[in-house]
From Swiss-Prot:
Domain ShKT: 80-115
Record bears the keyword Oxidoreductase: no
Glycan-carrying positions: 32, 39, 94, 181
Disulfide bonds: 80-115, 87-108, 98-112
InterPro entries documented for this protein: Calycin (IPR012674), Nitrobindin (IPR045165), ShKT_dom (IPR003582), THAP4-like_heme-bd (IPR014878)
One Pfam family, short name: THAP4_heme-bd
Stated name of the protein: Uncharacterized protein C28H8.5
Keywords: Disulfide bond, Glycoprotein, Signal
């Protein structure tokens, strides 16, 4: 039987799976090869070619198309991720829900750790003390490469990158006031490649207290900043959201006086992978409340 004129065959050594897919040595998965035939009447010739040169390859026949083409694809497991923004709070509130509640089991495989690598204990919401369970959605490493926007009448507008880490403090289980560690690092995206140039950083703690008389839950954030200021902020906690208001501000003795009079910091979980942060303030110059920074982070761990 003669081959179609259009089909040109060159002799070559039988390839190994690793030579076909150098990124996957040993090829621990099945390889799919599909061929579109020039002429269906010669399909048996093509099958003979496949059997000769690719004896261990699974193939599928695609009936007549105009051009001859080959393609392969690796069967890779689906990404291990949660599909509901409430997963952290659900699992923190009742860890047994991972096994006993179908909704949690099916939508929260990463938080339940039914797939992927084990989660670092600092980020494992199953280990959260009872007081912190309502803000379990905060826990994680959040990052925006270049999505931060800063604007205010007294400064030029600019864009920045920022990473926020919120983890379980080491001694949270042993203290009367369990805490989350909070760190934030912002950098100038306009600098040359290399180590990012810091423009601002913050380090502090997050705590939760329930007011029985008012039947409200309050969240506090106290921070020390790289510009020499220290702040204490408090606010009410809501479902996947908290709005802090500045209560106290201090500074080192040789730092300039703060012009901030009122400040609000809002954190809102938009979905299972995105956290929005906004900061609004009024100063001795502006006199009215205005937005100062806004950024949407992507969750990069766990």
């Amino acid at each position: 039987m003669r081959l179609p004129r259009r089909l040109k065959i060159k002799r070559f050594h039988k390839p190994s799976c690793s030579s076909i897919l150098p990124k996957y040595p040993g090829c621990p998965f099945s390889l799919n090869l599909s061929l579109s035939f020039l002429n269906f009447t010669h399909y048996d010739v093509h099958l003979q070619m496949i059997n000769r040169f690719f004896p261990n390859v699974y193939y599928s026949v695609v009936i007549p198309i105009i051009l001859l083409s080959t393609s392969y694809s690796a069967k890779i497991a689906p990404k291990c991720r949660d599909t509901d923004m409430n997963c952290a709070v659900w699992v923190a509130t009742n860890t047994s829900d991972c096994e006993n509640v179908e909704l949690v089991n099916s939508h929260c495989p990463r938080t339940c750790q039914t797939c992927g690598e084990p989660i670092d204990p600092k980020y494992d919401v199953k280990l959260l003390p009872a007081k912190l369970k309502s803000i379990a959605w905060m826990v994680g490493r959040w990052r925006s490469e270049f999505g931060g926007k800063a604007f205010f009448p007294t400064i030029p507008k600019f864009t920045y990158g920022e990473q926020v880490d919120i983890t379980i403090a080491d001694n949270s289980q042993d203290t009367h006031t369990p805490l989350l560690n909070y760190t934030a690092f912002a950098w100038d995206i306009n600098m040359p490649d290399g180590d990012p140039t810091e423009i601002h950083s913050e380090n502090g703690y997050i705590a939760v207290e329930y007011d029985k008389e008012q039947e409200k839950e309050y969240v506090s954030l106290n921070t020390a900043m790289s510009n020499g200021f220290m702040t204490i902020e408090e606010g009410e906690s809501g479902p996947n959201q908290v709005k802090f208001r500045l209560q106290r501000i201090g500074r080192i003795s040789f730092s300039h006086d703060s012009a901030v009079r009122i400040m609000f910091r809002e954190w809102t979980l938009l979905d299972e992978n995105r956290l929005e942060a906004r900061l609004l303030m009024t100063t001795t110059i502006t006199r009215r409340l205005m937005e100062h920074t806004a950024v949407i982070y992507k969750k990069i761990y766990p």
